[in-house]
Amino acid sequence: PAPDSSFIRDP
């Protein structure tokens, strides 16, 4: 999985 997905969260 992409590392960016790790920091993505719901606002």
Curated annotation (Swiss-Prot):
GO cellular component: extracellular region
Main location: secreted
GO BP, sorted A to Z: neuropeptide signaling pathway
Keywords per UniProt: Neuropeptide, Secreted
Subcellular location: Secreted
Residues forming coiled coils: none
Family (UniProt): Belongs to the FARP (FMRF amide related peptide) family.
Function: FMRFamides and FMRFamide-like peptides are neuropeptides.
Protein name: Extended FMRFamide-10
Species: Lobatophasma redelinghuysense
